[in-house]
């Protein structure tokens, strides 16, 4: 059993990184791997199936409703952004963009927050360097903020489900760290980003989403979260054998691999209800912070980079230094607070 689970874990971690077809169809791949892990781990039964069917419901509804609202309100939103851009200085606009998207992402979902970010960047028409910086800071903020509620992103949905906790558990556990990080990223965006008016900006591939695309994304999110629920249950024997006794500080740095792998997938493989709150906190903060370093680490990164045509190298130039600095700062916080 353990050997089979190790093979499945290796496939889950490596194939999305090396096989483009798997990366493009990550939700379906993880759905299949979730079934494989549950069968290999000997945990597939009616209660687990019921849980796997129920867990994705809230985030799926949130994604669908938010997608419809975004489609209907996109044009007015563009006009509002243009008016705000004319009325306030750019540093203040940059800070507000990063902070508000980060805080709202836990309600409107990380996916919709990323789509709004694409609209904002498209309207502002800054130089390429400044736009890339704004996107990276914003995606760090969105990735962190969305984890505060179980409807914000798949990682938080899965964490609440596996731990059997209430809606506001993550807000209590990592809320102070996440909210302070979101505000700090906003302040840094205001200070660091210096737009050059004459330079060439990003070429956006932004187009209005169709109802079919909204429905398709909704189905994929449902399958994604269902697969992660099965995956997390299937990996319980591995967690019990190898991770439960590890120091939370070691787990924190191990989770830097979230920079190249989807953090919800890693959360499914690592989190256990048998862990202490301090260990869960270290795991989540490590995953959330490092998830912003590179494009594959988080859903908002993938959406923004794809629609705005930001290359992996451009993202890494800004994302890696920001992420490493944030990891160091919050390691000290975890160590001494």
What are the functions of these language-model segments?
Residues 203-285:
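Transmembrane helical segments that form the transport core of multi-pass membrane transport proteins
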Residues 109-114, 132-163, 186, 190, ...:
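Alpha-helical transmembrane segments and, especially, the helix-loop junctions at the ends
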